[in-house]
Amino acid sequence: MILEWYWLALIGFITLFLGVFAVWKTQFKGPEAGIKPRMSDFARQAVTKAAEEHKIKLDFSADSIASIDKILEVFCRRHRAEPIAEKELSRIVLTWGAYVGTTLIKHHGGEWQRDSLVSGAYTYPIVFLKPITSNADKTIVRLSEAVPVMWCLKRIRHGFTESVAMRYKNVVKN
């Protein structure tokens, strides 16, 4: 009799937990929920800023990433002359990094995340799951990340040796 109550209580608890989880999942998507639309907004802003402020047309093609290096060189020179305030620098790298990342996702898949397993919190990586091997029993995947926002930050701080276009090509190649 006690054993029956135990199982009934356990089943009831599991059912309650699954119900609460289902409600939570539909109403609260967690910190990752708004990242994709925010990064899409930043990417659209990059296209507008490139045209208006730099007279460069961006079209979300892989070839357009070289233009991002040219734009970031302007910020690099400005930053060397007088350091850009951190808040403004964050906005700059989010805008241009979002464009690079959106282009990468468009052509090669992946998904925006807020935090990186490698680079840390608020670095906005793109996460890729790539199948390595597959057989009837299992598929082994490799998890990899690209951090275009951080690429843009390094490009501004360190100059042409931190080319965003080269990093993009390396990610695509691998």
Put a short name on every predicted segment.
Residues 126-174:
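A recognition module on extended beta-rich or small alphabeta surfaces enriched in W/G with H and D/E
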Residues 22-25, 170:
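Extended, well-ordered protein cores
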Residues 1-2, 53-62, 135-140:
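Short, exposed beta-strand "edge-strand" segments with a Pro/Gly-rich flavor and a Y/T-containing core
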Residues 1-10:
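Feature marks short, highly hydrophobic, charge-poor N-terminal signal-anchor/signal peptide-like helices
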Residues 10-19:
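Core hydrophobic alpha-helical transmembrane segments of single-pass membrane proteins
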Residues 87-147:
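Amphipathic protein-protein interaction modules
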Residues 21, 28-91:
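N-terminal low-complexity, intrinsically disordered segments
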